[in-house]
């Protein structure tokens, strides 16, 4: 019986080998699970636990087998340690890379956030600048509009003032023109009235002279001899004496005519004063044409003397003298003296 339970050398190595293999499998499984699910920890020295199973075999082969298994286990544990170190370094590298990536992501996020903030700040600043620019443009437009309105108001007021001034000047000018026109019309009327009056006086004098001439012709025929004897006299006194003999009516009428005609042609000079007098000698032909006029006694004022001579010469011709008998004309009017006075004219 005792020999029946005694094992062969191969049987005595079988179970230790199986146990060693199982042990290695368990160790590798535990290492794999530990590596797969273990949290990231700082590297630490691996702890290898070895279990030594005392086999009941007392044979040298069993001892050698156990030693071989132990050596294999130790070798296996050493390789496992290297694997774990490599994996640990790999994990640490991955962790560093992950941290670096996270830091980069954080930095990128911060940069993006900063960029976004900068863009927002820039947009806000641009918006504020545009608002300020728009406000300034609005104020400038309002100021420009106000200035334009001010200038327009000034121009309008200036135009109104100029219009008022022009209206006042036009009114003043019109009033002056009206006054001047009225004065001219009044002067014209006065001159016309005076001219009409003088013309009427001349016509009356002509009629009177014509009547007197007719009477003189009749009287001259009666006193022809005596009148001819007196023709040689050239003094004023003798002229007046002869006129008295021939008839004061004849000489008076012609003298009035001469006075009226000369008065119409006389233009009073500025230097003429009342009380002044000048005597002018008039020379005529039988047809009444005035051939000469000269000063026979001066007033002492040359302009006044010249105005008297010019008035006589401007008469030109007195046709009424043709009505006188030749003898009467020669004795009284071939040379006739006239006295000019500023206030009147007398012969």
UniProtKB/Swiss-Prot annotation:
Record topological domains on the Cytoplasmic side: 1-16
Membrane-side (Periplasmic) residue stretches: 38-347
Gene3D superfamilies for the chain: 3.30.1150.10
Primary location: membrane
GO CC, alphabetical: plasma membrane
Keyword match Cell cycle: yes
Cell location: Cell inner membrane
Membrane-protein topology: Single-pass membrane protein
UniProt feature, compositional bias: Basic and acidic residues: 112-206
Chain spans, region Disordered: 112-219
Matches recorded under InterPro entries: Tol-Pal_TolA (IPR014161), TonB/TolA_C (IPR006260)
UniProt GO molecular function: toxin transmembrane transporter activity
A single GO BP: bacteriocin transport
Entry keywords, A to Z: Cell cycle, Cell division, Cell inner membrane, Cell membrane, Membrane, Repeat, Transmembrane, Transmembrane helix
Keyword Membrane among UniProt keywords: yes
TM stretches of this protein: 17-37
Subunit structure: The Tol-Pal system is composed of five core proteins: the inner membrane proteins TolA, TolQ and TolR, the periplasmic protein TolB and the outer membrane protein Pal. They form a network linking the inner and outer membranes and the peptidoglycan layer.
Reported function: Part of the Tol-Pal system, which plays a role in outer membrane invagination during cell division and is important for maintaining outer membrane integrity.
Family, per entry: Belongs to the TolA family.
Entries under NCBIfam families matching the protein: tolA_full (TIGR02794), tonB_Cterm (TIGR01352)
Protein name according to UniProt: Tol-Pal system protein TolA
Chain's gene name: tolA
